[in-house]
Amino acid sequence: MTRTILPPPRALTLYDPHPNQGAEDYVDAATRVTKLRLQRGQQADAARVLLECCGQEGVFNLFYALLGARLCGCHRELKFGLQCAYWDEFKQLEGASLHRAANLAKLLAQLLGRAALPLAALRVVPWGSLEPRAVFFWQVCFTELLQLEPAMMRAAMAQLQEPAFAELRDGVMLFIGRHLRPLVLKKTPALSEALAELVALTIPVD
């Protein structure tokens, strides 16, 4: 299926993967985007289009994570544009539908795990004063992180142990204690081991 969206001034066409098709679908889509030779402002638009497409899906589609990671690896401005697009999403979470919030939360976890977005993107989050929909968003995001390959989760969150990330580390620890650990223990106890590893990553390295 082809989804065509028209960010000014040129069309950006993304291809959704068919269940019977292979991983070349996101590679093909990334190639098509690259061939558009988008300028700086247009790359920011492309990042927002990616989030919009993902958010509109009925369920999370890994295609967008694979495509986003590949584009971020090739286009620095698009990577920054994606980070800025997420910052805007963080401010508007209370108005987002549950399925949009869930899709974008899972996408963020996948992008962090694939080193497509930096952990520093989370520094703007007010961990001590989250609204209900934001709590849901971050519960979904961290639950998705816990389900990644252990090496991916470690790579995504290891910077929490660095002195420069002390404030973010404190915020994440607060969120884990208030909102993530109770959820895991109640609904997904199979993730307890992964949660313990995440908690270990919040212990500063001397």
Regions found by a protein language model. Give the residues of each.
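Solenoid-like repeat scaffolds
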Residues: 36-40, 55, 91-94, 128-131, ...
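Positions within ordered alpha-helical repeat solenoids
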Residues: 35, 52, 56, 69-73, ...
